[in-house]
Amino acid sequence: MNLMNPTTGPVAITSNGLVPMVIEQTARGERSFDIYSRLLKERVIFLVGQVEDHMANLVVAQLLFLESENPDKDIHLYINSPGGSVTAGMSIYDTMQFIKPDVSTMCIGQAASMGALLLTAGAAGKRYCLPNSRVMIHQPLGGYQGQASDIEIHTREILSIKHKLNEIISFHTGKPIEQVALDTDRDNFMNPQTAKDYGLIDEILQKRTV
C-alpha cells in the first residue's frame, strides 16, 4: 500500500475515542484524512463492535460506494465483533451477496454470532482469520413478554430466523444443515484452525504475502 509519504497529523476526537489523522502529500498539495477514510480509499472497511442499525447502514453505504467506484476490484472487510442484531446483520449480508465485487473477509480479534456469519459470507477462497482471533457460532437469542398468542407468534418467528441462519452457514461451509443445527445449539467457540476445518474460513494468515 502506497500512502504517498503520510505523516502523523492531528487527532480527531469522536464519541468512540481517538481517531488518528494522516497527512497525505501529493502533487496537488496536502490533504488530511481520518485513518478509516484513508483506508476506505484502499477498499478496506472495518466492521467493529456491536452489529446494530446505524453501524450496518454505514457498512452497507461503504460497500455500495466501493462498488460504484470499481465493480471489478475486491473489497476487504475486517471484522472484530461480538455480534448483535439479526436484521442489521442481514442487511450487510444481503448487500455483500448483491454487489458485484468479491468481498474478502478477515477476522481480527473475534467474530461471534452475527459477526461469524458475516465472516463466513465472504467470497469463497477469500475468508481469513489472524492467528490469535476466535470465532463463535450459536443460535439466535430472543425473549418476549405479552399475551400467549403474541408469544406464540414471536416463537415461530425466532425459530424461522434460526433456520434461516443455519441455512446460510450450511451454504457457505458446505456442512449439512442438520449438523449446523447441532453445532449452533449452544455457544460454540472455535480457534482459527477449528474454524478453517469447519469451513467458516479458508486460510489463517500469519504475514501479509504482498
UniProtKB/Swiss-Prot annotation:
The lineage of its organism: Bacteria, Pseudomonadati, Pseudomonadota, Gammaproteobacteria, Oceanospirillales. This is ATP-dependent Clp protease proteolytic subunit. It catalyses: Hydrolysis of proteins to small peptides in the presence of ATP and magnesium. alpha-casein is the usual test substrate. In the absence of ATP, only oligopeptides shorter than five residues are hydrolyzed (such as succinyl-Leu-Tyr-|-NHMec, and Leu-Tyr-Leu-|-Tyr-Trp, in which cleavage of the -Tyr-|-Leu- and -Tyr-|-Trp bonds also occurs). The active site is at 113 (nucleophile), 138. GO terms for cellular component: cytoplasm; endopeptidase Clp complex. Its EC number is 3.4.21.92. It comes from Marinomonas sp. (strain MWYL1). It is an enzyme of class 3 (hydrolase). Its main location: cytoplasm. The gene is clpP. PANTHER family: ATP-DEPENDENT CLP PROTEASE PROTEOLYTIC SUBUNIT (PTHR10381:SF70). It is found in: Cytoplasm. Fourteen ClpP subunits assemble into 2 heptameric rings which stack back to back to give a disk-like structure with a central cavity, resembling the structure of eukaryotic proteasomes.
